[in-house]
Every structure is written in structure tokens, then in C-alpha cells.
Amino acid sequence: MPEKKNTGPSYETIMRDLEARRFSPIYILMGEESYYIDKISDYIATHVLKPEERDFNQNIVFGADVTASQIVDSAKAYPMMAEKRVVIVKESQNLKGTEALEKYFKNPVASTILVLCHKNGSIDKRKKIIPSAQAGGGVIFESKKLYERELPGFIETYLRQHQVTIEPKAAQMIADHVGADLNRLTSELDKLLLSHLTTNGRVTPEVVEKEIGVSKDFNAFELRNAIIYRDIYKANLIIKYFDNNPKAGSLFSFLPMIFTYFENLMIAYYAPNRNNEN
């Protein structure tokens, strides 16, 4: 997956550390993109402790249902017949007051892994909870939404991790149809992986059209090509198709791809040395 735009460690770095069982006592996972927050917290919930250890050593609560003091009390408890204790606070943005947590962060219990999942935005870094967590050896992860232009790369990387490749046009078709909701996007990609419709481990536009319901003839790729080759009739045909079928997608989602093409065209046109090598 592409490196995320974070102020701290990337998703990939955090996952490598978790897989190597290099745990931090505090994780503050925050941001607009819930996908990476869920992936990290779910991994901690399912991999740190053995199934038989979780009943007495793992607590998963919601921010609206607990106080900061109750979270601290749970975090201060020592593990029973296990190496670690895990406390995960989902939707911690609903937590009222963090003073008790700030105090706990000054001297966190080494055997406890405390995870705060703050969704739908990031914590103001000027608030004491962030520097307090950092001083206590905590990991601060900020998960931001991917730009539209980054979605095809995300799709290619996700499928490659499952030993499947995808044609650029097919990746763009999916990105335009689904958008930047990574939970929904990965759900659609999982459908592709389960469909067994790939040809020699490769996803084609025909597969996307059949499995996801995206037209291989009416999409951003075809609109861009129609503009490039000055095929006014085809360009208007595609525009009219989406105007008459709003559920098929929005023309506005095509703009990043078209803009990028003309941006690159201008860069090439005004380059000082326009030759094949440059």
C-alpha cells in the first residue's frame, strides 16, 4: 500500500513493528480515514494475545461508555497468566476529558498496550494528550484520506499482495466508480478476488464490468482518450451517459485523471529540451 501522509510513523512501519512483536505502550490512532485505524487496532486485538488469554487480559470499550479514569484503571491492571494486557478504546473522540490519561502517559505500565481510536478527524496537536503520549513512548498515527489520483496505486498494491495484477484501465474504472472510501473499495476488491474471474491472475476491464458493474466503454479512461483524439461525438456520448445514469458515477470524479494528463502534457510541451531522452 502507498505510504500514508502522516506526521508520525506510516501504517506500513507500524504493522512491521506489530508483526515483529515490537509493541509500544500507547497508540493514538486518529484521522479522517478509518480504514487504517481499523486495520491497526484489529491486528492488535487479534494478534497480541492468544485466544485463551483474552478473557482476562483484553478490554475493548467505546469512548462514549467510559471515563478516562476507568480506562486508566483498566490499563494499570497487570496481565493474568499472559505477557501483555490490551485495552482498546474505539471512537475515543467521544471521550469526555483526558486529564487522567495525560497523567497516566507520564508513566505507562510497560505490560499494557493502550489503543485510542479517534475517528472523523485528528486531535489538536497543541493539546496535552499528544505530547504526553509521545513522552511516554507512544505511537501517534494520523490517517488521512487518499487523494483521488492515489486510488489506482492503492488498488494495484492491494491486489498485488494477493498475487493478482490489474490493468491500469481496470484500476481507474474501479477508482472512479467506488471513490475514496477505502473500506468500501477493499470490499469491492475482495469480491473480485473471490470471483475467480481473473485471467491468469490479472484483472481486466471486462472482469470489472462483469463483477462490479462498471462499463468498460463509459468511464474516465475512455473520456480522456476521446478528448485526446478529439472524438467529440464519443466524448459527448460518455458525458451524456453519466448525466442520464447518476448511479453509474460522477463526472467530477474524472477530473483528477483528466487534469493530470493535461498537466503532464504542459510540462512536456514547455520542457527546455523536448526529445525522447528527456
Map each language-model feature to its residues.
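Conserved beta/loop motifs at nucleotide-recognition and modification sites
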Residues: 1-278
